[in-house]
Amino acid sequence: MKEEKDILNRDVEIPEVVFRKADAALNQIRANTGSTKATRKVTRIQGRIHHVQAAAVACAVLIGAGGITATAAVIHHLWSRGMQANIQATEEQQKNLTDQGMVTQFDQAYTSANSDLTGMEVTSEGITVKPMEMIADGHFVHLSFQVEGYDLPDGEEPFFETVKVYTGDEETAEDSFVNMNGSFYNGIICDENGNPAYEDGTPLTADENGTTIERYKAEDGTLEYVMTLYKPDPEESLLGQMLHVQMENLGTVNKTMFMNGIEGTWSFDIPVSGKDAAQTYELNAPLENVNVTVLSAALSPISVRVDYEVTGEIQAQEDDNGLPEVGGVVLKDGSRMLYLLDGGQIGYQDDTHAYEISSFDRVIDVDQVQSLLF
């Protein structure tokens, strides 16, 4: 078992627009996590991301040669622009995920008379919403919707006043709860260094007031709403379940205030298809100075789960339970993919066992991963 040690010390400036969206996402998560155990936590994205000591643990046996590099901002799109921003991938990676059975492209289903997914678009008050794509593994579901017919004023941020997502027959049942983080895609992605940029690779620009200019509209004037979903119980998967999605009232938002709303309801029942493509590695690797042993890691192209054993006291703070978090991966060619994690949860299962599940903002080639960075 190879073990690396590495010191990362890097500050990344995050513009106000990204920080504001992180706050909105956190508030949405908090609103949706009332029934989860108190030991679980959602980590807030800070205005500055500071990486300090990181221990890298080997998580795969070397198989063959070769490697991959971090994806660039400008690529050919097979997926919708919002989904591509949510999970950046090369054209080859997009095809590979489709071949693995992890991708459902609803626009193809609409043209198939034999598909159970036909006729899913809903029109209310002249605004049509329809699912575009779904990417799912054993832990996370990414779902994108196209919104057509809404005239978004320049400089405004589109917003659904209410978005509900649940499984099962009863919305209020405990086992129906789904963690959800969703927003309209604003034309901004994070590059391979964790810095925000427009989807065409150009740097962000600001208006005369210094506010970052966001690009919600596609060339055809449509908008795209993208959500990431997972069950609060890390042992439960959404695969094979029926997602009930309801969006109500479309308008704009300014400093958390909903404005100019058009009353409407768009409801969908979406069966979750995908594939649990994770590869699990038994590690039993102690991390230095934190009294934590990494028992195992399960890597899929779009997410990671890590199971820990807590072997002694760890330093916890008010909003941080002190557990280590995955900081990236090292590939077999020696290159690193940092700033990968894009939301999830970390917490205790009992006094000595803990876990982390997190989605990635980029697709990775699991076979080319040599080690994890903490």
Segment roles from a protein language model:
Residues R10, A22, L26, I68-F374:
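Alpha-helical, hydrophobic structural elements that either
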